[in-house]
Structures are given as C-alpha cells and as structure tokens.
Amino acid sequence: MIKNIDRHRILILDFGSQYTQLLARRIREMGVYSELWPWDVAAERIQAFHPQGIILSGGPESATENDTPRAPDIIFTLGVPVLGICYGMQTMAIQLGGTVSNTHQGEFGYAPLALKNKNALIDGLEDFVNANNEPCLKVWMSHADKVTKLPEHFTCIASTETCPIAIMAHPEKHFYGVQFHPEVTHTLQGQSLLKRFVLQICQCEPLWTPRNIIDQTLSELKDQIGDDQVILGLSGGVDSAVTAILLHRAIGKSLTCVFVDNGLLRLNESQQVLNIFQDQFGLNIIHVSAANRFMNALKGIQDPEKKRKVIGRVFVDIFDEQAAKQKGVKWLAQGTIYTDLVESAASGTAKSHLIKSHHNVAGLPKEMKLGLIEPLKELFKDEVRQLGLELGLPNAMLHRHPFPGPGLGVRVLGEVKQEYCDLLRQADAIFIQELQKAELYQKVSQAFAVFLPIRSVGVMGDGRKYEWVIALRAIETVDFMTAHWAELPYDLLGRVSNRIINEVKGISRVVYDISGKPPATIEWE
C-alpha cells in the first residue's frame, strides 16, 4: 500500500469565486490532493501544510480598493510555485509591486488570447493560429479590473484585444498570473494548463486515486477504531452508503447501521436500501419504521424551516434511542464530505462566512459522548461516487439525483400528510421512469415531482372533479449554484402527464416548472 498519498498537495486560497470548488476538484481529478482555505488563513497554518504549490482563486471584489482581500505575504517567500487566477493574479501583481486599474471596460465570456512569449506554463498549448501567426487560446474571461503594470522581473506572456497583460510570469520564482478562468470547461485548454502547473511546475506525483484512497482509509479506520463498536445513520444516499461499506470493509460486524424509514422516502426506497446493504453486502442494520411518528410530529406545520427542524429533531430522537440500546458503542460515523465542511465554515482554517448549517456538521446530538468518525470528510461528491464504484455499489444508486435530507417533507408544500406523500411518491416514480426510458435521466442534473396542496377542477367521464395538482421540476446545472430548467421534449412531458393523471388517483392536473436559479431555487421549499 502506498502511504501518505496526500504528501504532494496544492493549497488553494479562496477569494470568493463561484468557481473555487470546481478548481479544487479539477486538481483532484489529476490525482493530486488539494485543499481549499479562506484567503485570510494564518501564515503558520500555511507553513505547517507544506504545499507543493499555491493557487490564488478569483473573487468578486475589486483589487483596486484598499480594503479588499490580499494574499498572506508569506506565500511569496516559501519557494513554491504560485498561480494567481483572475482576482488572484491582480492581488499578486499589487503585492509584488505592479499596478491594477479599473478600466470600466471589462471582459466577460469567450475571448481569443494570443501567446506573445514562450513560457513553461503554456508552451505547446494552442487552439488556433491568428492572422499574425501567433498561437492562440480560447479562454473564459470574467473581469473588470486588469493588470496595467507588471511587477519587477515579470514578463507578459499573452494578451487579448482589451487586456494587454492576460498572462504574466516570473520564470525564476515560478510565479504566474492568468486573467482568465482555466478551471471552467469554456477555457478549452484550461485543464491542460492546470496540469502543466500542478504536475510539471509543482512536480506533484498523482497518488490521489480511488484505489489508493480506499486502501489508506481502510488502514486509518482500523487503526483508529480497533475493536470498538461504531454506529452509523444509514439513509441510502451516496455519502452514507459509501461510509457504511468502507466501515464494513474495515471493521465488519463491529458496525451497526440505523436505517429510519420516516415515511418521506421515494417509492420502494426503504426495501431497496435493505436489499442492497443487508442482503447483498451483509451489513448489520436496525430498521426503524417510524412513518407515523414523523407524520404526527409534522401535523399542522406549514412553514418549511419548521418542517426541516421537526424532521431533524425526530430523527435525532430515534437515533439516540437506538444508540442507547447498543452496548459498547464508542464511535458515531457520519457521511460528511468536504463540501459540507467548506460550506459550513467548520473546517477551522480561518475566519469564513457561514453559508449554511449542514445537517451532518451542525446537527450532532450534544448529549452523545461518542467519538466522531468521518471517513469521507476530505472528498468531493464525485470522488465519493468513484470510491463507491470501486467498492461495488450499484451504479444506479451512486448516480441517483440529489434528494433533500427532509425527503418528501419539503416536496409536499405546506402541511405534510400521509395521503399527500403517497400520491407524490407515485407521481415522482412515473416521472423518473419516463426520463429513464427516454435516456434523459442522466442528461438532466435533477428531476422530481412536487405536490401542490391546491384543488383544481378536472373532467372525469361525464363529471367534474376537484383534485390535487402535481408540479414537475427538471434542471440542468454544473454546480447547483445556478441552474437552467431542462427543456424536455413535449411528447415526453405529455406521456408523463397522461400517466400521472390516469394512474395516480387523486391527481387531476400536472404542470411543468420553467423557473431558473436564480431567481427560483431548485427545490420549492
């Protein structure tokens, strides 16, 4: 087994770009470990991390303002390569003696970039040749400020029509700045440029692979747990599923999984979870049927946030009750992943604005005196899926669309009732079945049905009936931060509507949600 597979590591300092997590994932895809820290992290932490290279992300601020973020000065004294992207390039230029100006003429979208001088970062990269016989790249720009004077010993490597210094470099120190975004797919040679920086200039060895991650994680789990007992809340989602299989591989029957059927799951989901994890993989599972308990707790509650809190509280109560029945349990396992920690600002890297309180991070029962095990906390979702494939989990489970923690509790608008959940489950299953038949399920990022607690008139035979309404939602997105409604074929939508109205008794109308994000969110509640 290869040890210390994260010994070659890239540190990314986050200045607030919407693409920063994507940047970290791009580096992981090369097989190199990367971490994402806030820009104002303490200098001692950076030194202790021992990065092989440092990347400064983009950001929404103007580098021309005096009170905007700056990189810790220590990064320019460590003797490691530094790559500044967009805002990261601008703050690098200012901090090293250059000038950045707001020209009131930004660049947004595609731009042809002409390579003026040879450099290790971009030599051999080319999308086309321009009329001046210069090799050019098609890049994605998103900036209003630009570097107008180079720091001492820097060279201009590339230009666009409105940005004379689009790439700058200090060849001896291996400091580089690019005004565009290499991490997005719109920059055609972006991944090649990042690979050049990480693998060649920083000389990182690609050891961060699914097989190596599994081997190292299993070894660490065995050392950490020994002969102790571990308890895990199994939801059937990707994160808890991979956590369960990893722990089962490491400690076998010392793992007890608690699976709570809250009555808010998708059609047949409870049985599918038991079939896979209990029958196929042989996990020790305590199955708690608690639909009535959840429905009683939700009675009369319409506010979405209150519903979320009630569902979370009841789950914790049930989990506590089951944990108390187990003898000798010393560890609580969770499927926390890296994005949970980043978004909850709970990784303790520096001051960071709290984006949201994630249920895995903020919802721990305070009275539980158990050690915490989070074997996936350094992994992004796509890495977790890769581990799942290596571990033998079904592809269909690993690539299911996201499902909210409160389940159908936030897809039934207003008060949650068993009747509403039953209707919604059937309608949702029909929608997903038809998407799969049309081979469109994996082409949309997320698709689901929503129950609207309003009665609409319909005609059934010779009579008029007032029955419920179902809304269908399908979106396309790269990062779930912004999304476009999926332009599904009309004939598909027609089939789905006809099936739901004919097969789900109590539904008389089906509508399709064509709202983007923003202004709408992906979920209705």
Curated annotation (Swiss-Prot):
<dbReference type="Pfam" id="PF00958">
    <property type="entry name" value="GMP_synt_C"/>
</dbReference>
<dbReference type="GO" id="GO:0003921">
    <property type="term" value="F:GMP synthase activity"/>
</dbReference>
<feature type="domain" description="GMPS ATP-PPase">
    <location>
        <begin position="208"/>
        <end position="400"/>
    </location>
</feature>
<protein>
    <recommendedName>
        <fullName>GMP synthase [glutamine-hydrolyzing]</fullName>
        <ecNumber>6.3.5.2</ecNumber>
    </recommendedName>
</protein>
<dbReference type="InterPro" id="IPR025777">
    <property type="entry name" value="GMPS_ATP_PPase_dom"/>
</dbReference>
<dbReference type="Pfam" id="PF00117">
    <property type="entry name" value="GATase"/>
</dbReference>
<dbReference type="InterPro" id="IPR022955">
    <property type="entry name" value="GMP_synthase"/>
</dbReference>
<feature type="active site">
    <location>
        <position position="183"/>
    </location>
</feature>
<dbReference type="InterPro" id="IPR022310">
    <property type="entry name" value="NAD/GMP_synthase"/>
</dbReference>
<keyword id="KW-0332">GMP biosynthesis</keyword>
<comment type="function">
    <text>Catalyzes the synthesis of GMP from XMP.</text>
</comment>
<feature type="active site">
    <location>
        <position position="181"/>
    </location>
</feature>
<dbReference type="InterPro" id="IPR017926">
    <property type="entry name" value="GATASE"/>
</dbReference>
<keyword id="KW-0067">ATP-binding</keyword>
<dbReference type="GO" id="GO:0005829">
    <property type="term" value="C:cytosol"/>
</dbReference>
<keyword id="KW-0436">Ligase</keyword>
<keyword id="KW-0315">Glutamine amidotransferase</keyword>
<keyword id="KW-0547">Nucleotide-binding</keyword>
<comment type="pathway">
    <text>Purine metabolism; GMP biosynthesis; GMP from XMP (L-Gln route): step 1/1.</text>
</comment>
<dbReference type="Pfam" id="PF02540">
    <property type="entry name" value="NAD_synthase"/>
</dbReference>
<dbReference type="InterPro" id="IPR001674">
    <property type="entry name" value="GMP_synth_C"/>
</dbReference>
<feature type="domain" description="Glutamine amidotransferase type-1">
    <location>
        <begin position="9"/>
        <end position="207"/>
    </location>
</feature>
<dbReference type="InterPro" id="IPR029062">
    <property type="entry name" value="Class_I_gatase-like"/>
</dbReference>
<dbReference type="GO" id="GO:0005524">
    <property type="term" value="F:ATP binding"/>
</dbReference>
<feature type="binding site">
    <location>
        <begin position="235"/>
        <end position="241"/>
    </location>
    <ligand>
        <name>ATP</name>
    </ligand>
</feature>
<dbReference type="InterPro" id="IPR014729">
    <property type="entry name" value="Rossmann-like_a/b/a_fold"/>
</dbReference>
<comment type="subunit">
    <text>Homodimer.</text>
</comment>
<keyword id="KW-0658">Purine biosynthesis</keyword>
<feature type="active site" description="Nucleophile">
    <location>
        <position position="86"/>
    </location>
</feature>
<dbReference type="InterPro" id="IPR004739">
    <property type="entry name" value="GMP_synth_GATase"/>
</dbReference>
